[in-house]
């Protein structure tokens, strides 16, 4: 029987260049992926960037760049980190990619149809700086 193992890094928020914390979490994830492969698991190891939100918009404005152009540049530095660290990831996904958008829409529609997503009121804390 084939044993599957799915693991991801956090999806990194490209409001700035990668730092030691990004390297650390990537290396730890890579260690788990490699270990599971040694145990003959079919491993799917993903990493990537989450390119939506106010922080990205603010940083792009500070740099006098279009948010998409800003994300293209910064995400490329995150992608290059996978090569610099010799990570064994199977894919690098950006939330602005068409394939990601298509998958999210499909999953969202399934959740709506099943009643798992519904309109209601919610109170919570949100801060761009947190």
Write out the residue ranges for each language-model feature.
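N-terminal, positively charged nucleic-acid-binding surface of large information/translation enzymes
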Residues: 1-130
């Amino acid at each position: 029987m084939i044993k599957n193992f799915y693991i991801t890094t956090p999806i990194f928020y490209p409001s700035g260049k990668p730092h030691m914390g990004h390297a650390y979490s990537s290396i730890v994830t890579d260690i788990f992926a490699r270990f599971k492969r040694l145990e003959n698991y079919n491993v799917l190891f993903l990493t990537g960037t989450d390119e939506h939100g106010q922080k990205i918009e603010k940083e792009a404005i500070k740099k006098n760049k279009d948010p998409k152009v800003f994300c293209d540049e910064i995400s490329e530095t995150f992608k290059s980190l996978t090569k610099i660290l010799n990570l064994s990831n199977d894919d690098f996904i950006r939330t602005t990619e068409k394939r990601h958008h298509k998958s999210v829409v499909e999953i969202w529609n399934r959740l709506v149809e099943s009643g798992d997503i519904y309109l209601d009121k919610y109170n919570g804390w949100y801060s761009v700086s947190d």
